[in-house]
């Protein structure tokens, strides 16, 4: 009998994470989207040269775009391609998903935030979070709760000894 191929691969499929988004926003829902990339950008993503922390997602003319995402070109990139690391990139979603996002942004006053970028087979995907901004007191209560959970875990660990 033939061996079955293992689907587990060494390493992670995650390319980049926006940890700041969880601190700045209440993320209500996350939707997966494809990204329209050029060849040199895919090569840079494979080497992990991307930053989505300062990026933002917006709607224009019924389409979804991401701006502020920096993909640093490789040193060995070809000379005839002019690389723009911060160009505006189109996100690829179904019309139903786009209409849903447009409705939530316009009616409910929600914001679109890029949370995670990862590989699905050979395709680069990005998770777009539908979020609402946190106030300063919300951030304070979150940090207090996080500290308390850390202290609680420390106390439980020491009491088991």
From Swiss-Prot:
UniProtKB keywords: Cytoplasm, RNA-binding
Region named Disordered: 138-161
UniProt-listed PROSITE patterns: SSRP
GO CC aspect terms: cytosol
Extent of Basic and acidic residues compositional bias: 139-154
One Pfam family matching this protein: SmpB
Molecular function terms from GO: RNA binding
Single Gene Ontology BP annotation: trans-translation
InterPro entries noted in UniProt: SmpB (IPR023620), SsrA-bd_prot (IPR000037), SsrA-bd_prot_CS (IPR020081)
Cell compartment(s), UniProt: Cytoplasm
Function statement: Required for rescue of stalled ribosomes mediated by trans-translation. Binds to transfer-messenger RNA (tmRNA), required for stable association of tmRNA with ribosomes. tmRNA and SmpB together mimic tRNA shape, replacing the anticodon stem-loop with SmpB. tmRNA is encoded by the ssrA gene; the 2 termini fold to resemble tRNA(Ala) and it encodes a 'tag peptide', a short internal open reading frame. During trans-translation Ala-aminoacylated tmRNA acts like a tRNA, entering the A-site of stalled ribosomes, displacing the stalled mRNA.
Family, similarity comment: Belongs to the SmpB family.
PANTHER family: SSRA-BINDING PROTEIN, TMRNA-BINDING COMPONENT OF TRANS-TRANSLATION TAGGING COMPLEX
NCBIfam families (UniProt xref): PRK05422.1 (NF003843), smpB (TIGR00086)
Protein name per UniProt: SsrA-binding protein
Gene name, Swiss-Prot/TrEMBL: smpB
């Amino acid at each position: 009998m033939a061996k079955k191929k293992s689907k587990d691969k060494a390493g992670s499929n995650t390319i980049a994470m926006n940890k700041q988004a969880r601190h700045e926003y209440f993320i209500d829902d996350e939707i997966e989207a494809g990204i329209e990339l050029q060849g040199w950008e895919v090569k840079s993503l494979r080497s992990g040269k991307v930053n989505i922390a300062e990026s933002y997602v917006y709607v224009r003319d019924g389409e979804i775009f991401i701006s502020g995402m920096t993909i640093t070109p490789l040193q060995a990139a070809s000379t005839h391609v002019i690389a723009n690391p911060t160009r505006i990139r189109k996100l690829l979603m179904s019309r139903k998903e786009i209409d849903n996002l447009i409705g939530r942004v316009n009616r409910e006053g929600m914001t679109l935030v890029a949370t995670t970028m990862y590989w699905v087979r050979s395709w680069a995907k990005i998770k777009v979070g539908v979020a609402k901004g946190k106030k300063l007191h919300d951030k304070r209560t979150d940090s207090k709760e996080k500290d308390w959970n850390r202290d609680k875990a420390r106390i439980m660990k020491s009491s088991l000894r």
